[in-house]
Design a protein with these regions (language model features):
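Helix-boundary and loop/linker segments of multi-pass membrane transporters
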Residues: 6-10, 53, 87, 130-131, ...
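Transmembrane alpha-helix interface motif
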Residues: 2-45, 156-296
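Membrane-helix interface segments
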Residues: 30, 50, 133-136
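Membrane-interface helix-boundary motifs at transmembrane edges
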Residues: 46-55
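N-terminal leader/targeting helix
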Residues: 55-56, 183
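Juxtamembrane/interface alpha-helical elements of multi-pass membrane proteins
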Residues: 56-174, 290-296
Length: 296
């Protein structure tokens, strides 16, 4: 069965998302932002398919556009004046570029977090942090599961409320508002009760007690070790490039970045390889499957 990047050891998944999320939030060079955004979108497409990726981008792109528009509307710093707004404030190239960069950073972080919630399931989080920080791992795993479960339960509750109404849509804005408020109140109560029941259940099973053992299906295989070496190698090289100033960029007072040299180009290439790791691994696995199928 093909499982792609999600089938790797939880340590591989956790290290990858720690690296790409840190890079998306720290590296503000336009090329790094573009690599991170494209890598996140390609990984999302590889993991979840075209339909879910299109739905995710439907929410992400407007948020990016909003961030790109808001910054030049309120920030007027910068030396290159393009024009003047009706308020009399200047519209500068630097504020516009900073807004675009902020939008790209926001979009890439949102896409990477969507990939992270898909790959880092609750059992993986409990496996990684259950021994060292059992309470934190339980809370974190419940938090990652909360949004999709809350959405499903809200949709189910709305359907039940409509069924009690004879299956008819509520008439008028006021009736629809009452239905929405009632459904939201029911789901909030359900989520609180579910959290308490989960905590009581885990406590009854001895979760978090000293010396407690737990069964795990995860084993560090040879391919996991190679993936860890791959991630640590590219991640360490990108970190060295960032500390050396090879990925530096300045938005104010003028746009300025590190000169492009073979050395700085290698830093960008390393970051590209890092961000597209899930796509590369999925492509390699698909190639092996096709080769195995051709021999049958």
């Amino acid at each position: 069965m093909r499982d792609g990047f999600a089938g790797y050891h939880p340590a591989v998944n956790a290290l990858f998302f720690a690296l790409v999320l840190a890079g998306a939030m720290v590296l503000d060079h336009p090329l790094c932002l573009a690599i991170s955004l494209c890598g996140g979108a390609a990984s999302h497409l590889s993991m979840m398919g075209r339909q879910k990726t299109g739905k995710a981008l439907w929410y992400v792109l407007p948020m990016m556009a909003l961030a790109a528009v808001v910054n030049p509307a309120f920030s007027h710093a910068g030396a290159t004046i393009l024009t003047y707004l009706p308020s009399g404030n200047p519209l500068t190239l630097e504020s516009l570029a900073y807004g675009l960069g902020a939008g790209a950073m926001l979009g890439s972080v949102m896409v990477w977090f969507a990939c992270c919630t898909h790959v880092m399931t609750a059992d993986k989080l409990v496996y990684l942090f259950g021994r060292t920080a059992p309470a934190l791992s339980l809370v974190f795993s419940m938090t990652l599961r909360f949004v999709p479960r809350f959405s499903r339960q809200l949709s189910l509750t709305v359907q039940v409320q409509r069924g009690l109404n004879g299956g008819e849509e509520p008439d008028g804005l006021w009736q629809r508002l009452r239905l929405g408020v009632r459904a939201l109140s029911i789901v909030i109560t359900w989520s609180l009760e579910n959290g308490v029941e989960t905590a009581d259940s885990m406590r009854a099973r001895g979760y978090g007690l000293p010396g407690r053992t737990a069964f795990s299906i995860y084993r560090l295989t040879e391919r996991d070790r190679l993936a860890l070496v791959w991630l640590m190698g590219w991640g360490g090289y990108v970190l060295c490039g960032a500390l050396a100033g090879g990925l530096g960029w300045r938005y104010y007072p003028t746009l300025r970045g590190t000169a492009v040299t073979p050395l700085t180009a290698s830093f960008f290439g390393a970051y590209l390889a890092l961000c597209f790791t899930p796509v590369i691994l999925d492509w390699e696995e698909g190639r092996r499957w096709r080769r195995s199928a051709s021999k049958i």
